[in-house]
Amino acid sequence: MRRVIHFDELNSTSVYSHQHLEELENFDVVSCDKQTFGHGQFERKWYSSDKNGGNVYISIILKPSNLEHLNELTRFIALIAASTLEEYGLKPAFKFPNDILINGKKIAGFLAESEFIGTTCKGIIVGCGINLNLEENELKNIDQPATSIFNETKKRVDKKEFLDKLFFNFEKEYEEFLVSGIKGEKLC
């Protein structure tokens, strides 16, 4: 099962995970309430707020024995997150390779980074940023059209409850994904 290593504030869950990859285990989750230097693909800055119950800023550590479907991992994580967002009555769309949109606005982003020594994979760090409770005035700080579950539903989201659902969906599908890859668009 997973172990969650939580911080009030980090520069980045991804940076911490890279620095501590040796001691982190398969399925460990590094999380924080606020990132001071969160980033996505191409080092794009990820806006971080710890107001109103917060958002999701996590890195999931994976140390798979089978790397056959590694090229599908970001898409797999996005499908799992989309399935979780659907549980809140939202209709997610994908902007592949690594974004989820609601009504054309970004609600989540993912970044999978692997570390190899020669041909041996030391681990994969899957960074996830998901906007749970950002309000309209905070969304204006983001350099692209963005939204949050709260902005779409006008209901506050309990971060622990959301993460429990996300991890449940992930753990339910992950072993099959390692063996078979993504089968169709719908998981969960």
Regions found by a protein language model. Give the residues of each.
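Active-site metal-binding loops of divalent metal-dependent hydrolases
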Residues: 33-35, 100, 130
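Long, positively charged amphipathic alpha-helical accessory segments at protein N-termini or as interdomain linkers
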Residues: 65-68, 72-92, 102-188
